């Protein structure tokens, strides 16, 4: 099965950019416009990594991650946010986020984190 990444982002232009870059890197890319849509999609289509924004309509990234962890999901979650305060970062990690990036960031850093996750996943 191909490595699958879900992008959870309410800004369509940002979703398109992530999709373009990740697809060109060889990943299967799923998309959702907010946490609620992501949970609905994940109910039928699993993924390996979720890249999620924090603040979105209906359900934000932190609430989505809390719900996933309550469902015993072990999916790897990378949160990206423009609200990069130490308290926000702690809040995200307590909710179950695996990695945290503050916008703006270099896409190469995000791609490297995804690559490292898949490299470690391959190790028996």
Where are the predicted features?
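Charged docking surfaces used in two-component/phosphorelay signaling
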Residues: 16-24
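Short hydrophobic/Thr-rich beta-strand motif most characteristic of the beta2 strand and flanking loop
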Residues: 26-33, 41
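Receiver (REC) domain active-site loop signature in two-component systems and cognate sites
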Residues: 56
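C-terminal output helix
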Residues: 87, 105-115
């Amino acid at each position: 099965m191909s490595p699958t990444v879900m992008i959870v982002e309410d800004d369509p232009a940002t979703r398109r950019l992530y999709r373009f870059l990740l697809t060109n890197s060889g990943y299967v890319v799923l998309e959702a416009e907010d946490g609620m849509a992501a949970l609905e999609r994940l109910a039928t289509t699993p993924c390996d990594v979720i890249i999620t924004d924090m603040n979105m309509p209906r359900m934000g990234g932190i609430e989505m991650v809390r719900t996933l962890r309550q469902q015993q999901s072990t999916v790897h979650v990378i949160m990206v946010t423009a609200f990069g305060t130490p308290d926000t970062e702690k809040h995200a990690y307590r909710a179950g986020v695996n990695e945290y990036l503050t916008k703006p960031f270099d896409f190469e850093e995000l791609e490297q984190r995804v690559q490292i996750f898949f490299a470690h996943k391959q190790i028996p």
